[in-house]
Amino acid sequence: MSTIENLTAHTPMMQQYLKLKAQHPEILLFYRMGDFYELFYDDAKRASQLLDISLTKRGASAGEPIPMAGIPHHAVENYLAKLVNQGESVAICEQIGDPATSKGPVERKVVRIVTPGTISDEALLQERQDNLLAAIWQDSKGYGYAALDISSGRFRLSEPADRETMAAELQRTNPAELLYAEDFAEMALIDGRRGLRRRPLWEFEIDTARQQLNLQFGTRDLIGFGVENAPRGLCAAGCLLQYVKDTQRTTLPHIRSITMERQQDSIIMDAATRRNLEITQNLAGGVENTLAAVLDSTVTPMGSRMLKRWLHMPVRDTNVLVSRQQTIGALQDRFTELQPVLRQVGDLERILARLALRTARPRDLARMRHAFQQLPTLRAQLAEVNSTPVQKLRETMGEFTELCELLERAVVEAPPVLVRDGGVIAPGYHEELDEWRALADGATDYLDKLEIRERERLGLDTLKVGYNAIHGYYIQISRGQSHHAPIHYVRRQTLKNAERYIIPELKEYEDKVLTSKGKALALEKQLYEELFDMLMPHLADLQASASALAELDVLINLAERADTLNYACPTFIDKPGIRITEGRHPVVEQVLREPFIANPLNLSPQRRMLIITGPNMGGKSTYMRQTALIALLAYIGSYVPAQKVEIGPIDRIFTRVGAADDLASGRSTFMVEMTETANILHNATENSLVLMDEIGRGTSTYDGLSLAWACAESLANKIKALTLFATHYFELTQLPEKMEGVANVHLDALEHGDTIAFMHTVQDGAASKSYGLAVAALAGVPKEVIKRARQKLRELESLSPNAAATQVDGSQMSLLMPAEETSPAMEALENLDPDSLTPRQALEWIYRLKNLV
């Protein structure tokens, strides 16, 4: 904006605006003017497009018309929500000076910066989703990543070793805003993400980061947090903390610790796996028919958010898992009485964050009081539950009787939205406030008496006393009787059918009332701030209580789901393997109108890979996904949709299921498929669960078959992972004859004429046929095309019965075989240009080639 270069050419107000705007050049500036927030120049044009509001002009400054857009201050939250959802940040500039005493423009300053990752206002947040601010750092040794939920104070860092792990972490956390260094090399990793913020290199400096974090936590070093030896993670965390301080412009007492997330503590799932399993988001980008949608009947928003974190970070520590299982078992006959009480607790976690940031509104304090009022009942109900983990949660929950009594005394039953509206502090809490209020409230009686007195004295039946915000108190007389107004009645306003007057007595009373109202409101604001000061020392205990209540909500919810949906408690075993009796897909069984066909599964060190064949739509993908989802549920401590489950250690879950062209990156379906396959072959171990669906279908038949065979061979013989390998290549059903630990299973169907019935039952052995033409007919492919396809199928089968199978041998199909050597004569011929040879040279070449052969 060139306007900043010549400030003196502008009006004093525009000079003030331009100076403030220069401090925030890359974000929108909401500049408070009276009852509106105004935007000027390029900001006005952008806001007009983003918010669909009118673009106007405000006079001229420096001889040029000023583009302007404005929004009413009382509707600012709605507009902020729209901007934040589009990844925009906004600096809020307020009037802090008194217009009555200001000689030039009223003093203004930016009081807060609203960004997608640092919002805490409930109007701007998704209630049942975490809203994270993250920072990413990269050097030659790997990545550093830090994520903060400012609405709870939860602060985490990690050090992903490679690009795939970093991509998985970004998808798991899905930050609303992502900070990155100006020299960040892997832009392809983050391009297209919302809320990207480029930051200067010095903000990622390690010594500054340590200093910032120690200052925040009041510590001398970071050893106690277990992050001292995570330099890359600390670089990211330091930048993130600096950014939060810059935007919030206040202390952050609710951010009291930082935790290191280590890969070995949880089951690792890459980005493709999270997407394919539809954990919290379906493949279309929505939330319907996901695992979370089925599993989440939590009664508090903070419980819902915790459940989703559990689903994305399954735990490998069986002690934690068994403890959760026992708690769920203990709560199974209690959820009907506990859930209605817990529902009343609400979102205590986010209320506490707003308290810490000193942005809590009166209704937040009322909700906090209501949450405290539930604790005695909840603690009494939990006292009867015979479970050590439950009793620990009950203890952590606390009771906060004194704080509850304070809020009951101090805050009215149903407070207004904002403290500036007045009427927040309860009568009887503060003597001086009551006196000022009595004076202000006494106005009604006085005005009634004045109106009766003047009406009777003057004999004017249309006379009445009123008040409006612009003209203050007045006496109104109809136009027809206005000529009877006494001489000391001073005309204040003329209306179409009436005249309004002021008298010295009324003016004197108005000053008195307005003074008392102003004094009452100022005192009320002071008392409101003092309430924050009284609550703040208890913040750590309150946050621990909110966390315990959220965990209790998750566990009670899992108990209710287990009971309602007929889930069983899985057993953890030491040896690798998964044994499932009557397993079901948790989502599909809820969507189907007919009963879901349950199926068994047996994977063990002696039976590591299942080759799954059967028709399209026969249920292969459902069977594979349900296995992964049952494993995932077991490793968050939940009961699972099966009659019985025994499950061994799992370190990673991989899925290579379905793919689409990645047009943005210029990658074909086959390239996407091969990239995911390469990731599995490089990173899977004998404790990994691998789902491979239709590998190799994106290329020619023999290429695809060769790749599928080699991948299956590597997974079964070299990696020894627990693998479900679905395929249409019937040649792969020979693998069990050639390799140990591989078995065939199939999903069957019955064909009758042109119709097909899918049995959805898993049986041992290979499928007898594909039923592809029957499925095509079912999909509505024209009959003449199906008829022609049957003819062609018979021709191909008669020409080449199982031709491919005769060419595939496990001992020869490994992709790792060295290429055949090329003969010297062939190499010489390939490099020869016959058109450039003379007859003599050609003759010499013939002799040379003869010698090479």
Curated annotation (Swiss-Prot):
GO terms for MF: ATP binding; ATP-dependent DNA damage sensor activity; damaged DNA binding; mismatched DNA binding
Any Pfam family hit: MutS_IV
One GO CC term on file: cytosol
Keywords: ATP-binding, DNA damage, DNA repair, DNA-binding, Nucleotide-binding
Top-level taxon: Bacteria
Gene3D superfamilies linked to this entry: 1.10.1420.10, 6.10.140.430, DNA repair protein MutS, domain I, MutS, connector domain, P-loop containing nucleotide triphosphate hydrolases
Residues where ATP binds: 614-621
Similarity remark: Belongs to the DNA mismatch repair MutS family.
Function: This protein is involved in the repair of mismatches in DNA. It is possible that it carries out the mismatch recognition step. This protein has a weak ATPase activity.
PANTHER family to which the protein is assigned, alphabetical: DNA MISMATCH REPAIR PROTEIN MSH1, MITOCHONDRIAL, DNA MISMATCH REPAIR PROTEIN MUTS FAMILY MEMBER
Identification of the protein by name: DNA mismatch repair protein MutS
Organism of origin: Enterobacter sp. (strain 638)
Primary gene name: mutS
